[in-house]
Amino acid sequence: MMKKYIKSITVLLVILFSVSSVSAATLTQRLADGHKLRLGFGTAVPWAYAGDNGEALGFVNMIALTVLEEMGITEHETKVFEWSGLIPGINADRSDMITGGMYILKSRCENINFSDPIGVFGDAMLVPKGNPKGINNYADVIRTGATLVTGTGFNTVEAAKKFGVPDSQMLLVEGEVGILAAMKAGRADAAVQTFFGAKEHEEKTGGAFEVTDPKLMPKETVNVVGIGFRKSDNEFREAFNAALAKV
């Protein structure tokens, strides 16, 4: 009986050690061992989103896949998260790359590393057609006492606070879907998001909402976008950057 017990414990320890070893391996090592690369992103049209069959769509995913192909990597899996779960997800080993169209911010660099920039983008306000309250930037939100909606974990949360929008005027929801739902329901007077995200909502609603001129936003709201990696995967990140420079 004791021998059987010891054997069971030994098998369990071997399994646990194997799992922890896989988790501790770098992305470069994993791919060499035959594991598929896992792309992590949210639902943020046109940046990154999953198609009907789970395929990675959106222009940031297309850039990432083109670079990976340059590296000789043609197989991957998709992992869809809420935006606020992207960084916790990659650090919990649930994905290998963040391809959601994430701005490179100091606060994010404390938890992950980024590729070289893939583009420069700005934010804008989404408002009801005709912009009845005249909201074009954070100062207008404060001046009018408007309720401003944005996504949990979005760069715009930090930006709104930086420019003085009080918590009492902020509504935080999950992702792009939550933002549009809040605007449709009249729970907010304006939404702040990336210009491309706002344009997508404008088009999706048939003109019920409009996008303000991003040039009326503070210049500090223009940011660069990169692909996110675990800090332990710097070797792979450097190889990705080298391939990015070629495409």
Stretch-by-stretch model annotation:
Residues 58-70, 131, 139, 154, ...:
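Extended ligand-binding regions for polar small-molecule ligands
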Residues 37, 45, 120-125, 131, ...:
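Small-molecule pocket liners
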Residues 35-43, 57, 138-153:
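Short loop->beta-strand "edge-of-pocket" segments that line small-molecule binding or catalytic clefts
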Residues 85, 101-110, 158-162, 189-221:
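A ligand-binding cleft/hinge motif common to bilobed small-molecule-binding domains
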Residues 25-101, 110:
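Extracytoplasmic small-molecule ligand-binding "clamshell" domains
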Residues 50-52, 64-74, 138-139, 154-174, ...:
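Ligand-binding cleft/hinge of the Venus flytrap
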Residues 65, 76-140, 216-218:
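Acidic, polar ligand-binding/catalytic clefts
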Residues 120-124, 195, 203-244:
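Periplasmic-binding protein-like
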